[in-house]
Amino acid sequence: MKKARETDGSMEPPKSPSRLTLRGLDWLNFLLADVRTGVGPFLAIYLAGYKWDEERVGLALTVGGIAGILTQTPAGALVDFLRSKRALVAVGVAALAAGALLIALFPSFWPLMGAQVLIGGTSSIFIPAICAMSLGIVGHAAFDTRQGRNQTFNSAGNVAAAVLMGLLGYLVSNRSIFFFVVALAVPTILILLLIKPAEIDYQLARGANDGEKGGKAESVWVLFRDRPLVIFLTCAVMFHFANAAMLPLLGELLAKGQGRSSMLFMSACVVTTQFVITLLSSWSGRKAGTWGRKPLLLIAFGVLPIRGILYTLTSNTELLVAIQVLDGIGAGIFGVVSVLVIADLTRGTGRFKLTLGAITTAVGIGASLSQVIAGGIVHRVGSHAGFLFLAAVASAAFAILYFLMPETRNLRLAKE
């Protein structure tokens, strides 16, 4: 592990990917966001129209989430192992479309549970596969900027999907959203053809150094004995534990006395967050290469407790929506910089996507626990107590990051 980090970035030859491949990556991020967004957020409303009660809707959503958590680490390992990243993404998109079609045609219990397992399981492929292709195409030197650009197009796709599919549900039917996802899978798969496989360096794509052709990947257990990686894992889990329940709690707050308009305000919250993420993502990628990773992470972690406290200070709907700007700042920075930190810490190990998948699994578990624990606090004590509890966890995460986490941008150059 130490030796890998001492490898000078100058040993990696400069990458010169074609414009067509880079545009293909851009639009793949945009379209994948559309496909993935179309299945999740509208499912509860769709099932309610078929007289599903809250318990069964909650079970359906939980099954998909559990499938995603359980497959994150295997998906990362699979991406590291397979050379054909494009084919893997294509299979994932096709499987997701099949799940959406199953939901649209058979909105009964068992078919829908099967569809949720299929969708949750295959969705785990996309993030590590996109990161792998990006790293293999542009190399470590340009990965900061590329990851920021990926997140920008992903967030723009999320905004477009939220608006377009909301209009489809309003003007046509909720069911039409899932048919649209199926149709959207076709251009998403076709856009993969723009990405030239010859421009994806397999060794770089799995996090090895250039020139280590056929090198053996380090054991994942060795990686997780690495102190900075364990510290970052702890911080990431706490960040998502503090963050995951805030928007659902806000939704309950907005629903009080708002009637049907509560859905409109919730949509405004989502669009506000994604718009800020879109603006910040490219900036975060650029600044991560000059400022370093830690200063940006401190900003992301710092706004989270402030956001939790602000929710307790007002009941004004417009102000509550405006506070979502802080959500966009935190998510926009963390979404870009967290991947860069993992790339820094696993460089030369050949375990980039496996580690990314393992951390995403842990983060998913933390987010799930957030919903349960914060929900219990709100039920017994009230929403203000729930927000303050989450703010306290976020403050603890900030303290651990500030005092214990090293800067990772040049960590591989240090003589340890």
Where are these regions (language model features)?
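Juxtamembrane intracellular "pre-TM" segments in multi-pass secondary transporters
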Residues: R5-L22, E199-F232, E416
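Helix-to-loop junctions at the C-terminal end of transmembrane segments
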Residues: T71-S84, G169, L280-G292, V378
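Helix-loop boundary and gating motifs at the non-cytosolic
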Residues: E12-G65, V230-I231, C235, H240-L254
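C-terminal membrane-cytosol helix-exit motif in multi-pass small-molecule transporters
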Residues: A183-A205, A397-M405
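Interfacial helix-cap and linker-helix signal at transmembrane-aqueous boundaries
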Residues: L47-A48, L78-V79, L167-V172, L254-A255, ...
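Cytoplasmic helix-loop-helix junction between adjacent transmembrane helices
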Residues: V117-N154, V341
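Structural signature of the two symmetry-related core transmembrane helices
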Residues: A87-L101, V182, P295-I309
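A membrane-interface helix-boundary motif in multi-pass transporters
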Residues: Y170-A183, G376-A394
